[in-house]
């Protein structure tokens, strides 16, 4: 379904030489230097971030009705209305930092009014309760991957060469934990966290329900696609499709926190070469996030103890990505500036 080329390493020596010849001691820009090299591989000799687009996928989860969150299921729709009105954290950050923001209904309980301006990519009215039955069908997974790819292609046609991913969905940390456990061969207790900030009793119930879901679907968890069908979320599936669609186009993706990283994990399990197109924005306060980052050998750009979702961490990482591209493209070399290179 996806045709993803591995990233060429033919220019690596040339790229590193370019970075080392900038008017600075070698390595003095720290983590910005490998980030700049990564962008030069993906975007060419003069990398420049054009029209960055933040895609926020919203969906509801059947497991939310079992009381795994501090918020009831209807809050998903209420927050999407807040996004549409421009009042959420992701709106503030996108306005400040120059992101193009698109809100996408991947499968909320109720479709928002057309005048709200939310893109319709609905796969259903929320997933099935994963502790009782499958979240969705394999056909819905296929359609969701295609929806995610199509949204990326639409932005790319307008000049976008960097995609940010965010999400909204009450109950989605439970689904994400189940997906993570199934894809990494872990137990529920290793993957379930406090999400929206639940108390100890709710955390115990959440862990029990995720364990129940994994046991119920054990014989079906044989591929990334079947894992998504059994225990995933509509927004997780569509983010996975967006990642694969961006990789297919050869453009990088800024991955947000725990939920978005679960989609990244699914994408990498489907197409390992898609890993090379991912930039991980921040380390979430959600405990299990670090396990996924380590599994994918990822070092995030930021660590701010955030756990909001919405794409907020990815949004805040944009200036660092721009700075890496800009210094690679604009910073003078020693010879250009007439400075003696004393680097040993």
Curated annotation (Swiss-Prot):
Gene: cobT
Database matches in SUPFAM superfamilies: Nicotinate mononucleotide:5,6-dimethylbenzimidazole phosphoribosyltransferase (CobT) (SSF52733)
Keyword annotations: Cobalamin biosynthesis, Glycosyltransferase, Transferase
Key word 4Fe-4S present: no
Family according to the record: Belongs to the CobT family.
Taxonomic superkingdom: Bacteria
Protein name (record): Nicotinate-nucleotide--dimethylbenzimidazole phosphoribosyltransferase
EC main group: transferase
